[in-house]
């Protein structure tokens, strides 16, 4: 993704990512302001009102991937402009598992392009509000089916089916995953330390895919998907308990695996 010119923040972000051992070869610095989003959470932090979205440098960003990234096991297109997502997908035709996230701005303003991108990926990971908005249906299960069939996307089912799998994040309601072998429902990890839900979706998707990386044929492997959802749920529960990335950036393996074990007992998974 592109980074704006808020230099001190860039340096800090780069240090955090490098410390985590991530390959930053594809990160580009561009002149201009960094993408900014502002929102307001209310009540039990379940509903969010977007106050402003400033695309800034990402508006004209043309992603060009390093050659070493051309054949990834897992390709995750985070919630940037759908045209950028399509550009990345086109550069990785041999990716083994392709996944997409989005948010309301693109649903409202770039639905045709977003629909094209959703039809090209294996998995879409979005929240319940976004699923229902795309489908124009408040019944979640029905809305999910219409997205997978392609009926809810631009052009309808005649333009082709949607993603093979759809995962709906439901906040304290847990997660509902519609997959080729059926549907999985899992609860949220119970916590009273609700500080900042921002970024929970990103950490959910990232940890879900990190578990699946290197496991061929995962979309038909119910145990692999269930275990990936365990890790996704636990990771996002840590994100919820701090501001931004503060909590997951400082977590230790012992605390993480203790929570994974606790959650497994809650949901009855050995």
Where would I find each of the regions flagged by the language model?
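A short acidic, amphipathic alpha-helical/loop segment
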Residues: 16, 84-91, 112-116
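Redox-cofactor binding/interface segments in oxidoreductases and associated redox assembly factors
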Residues: 75-77, 100, 126
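Short, small-residue-biased leader/transition segments that mark boundaries at the very start
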Residues: 2-7
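Conserved post-catalytic alpha-helical subdomain immediately downstream of the catalytic base
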Residues: 189-262, 266-269
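Short beta->alpha connector loops
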Residues: 9, 79-84, 103-107
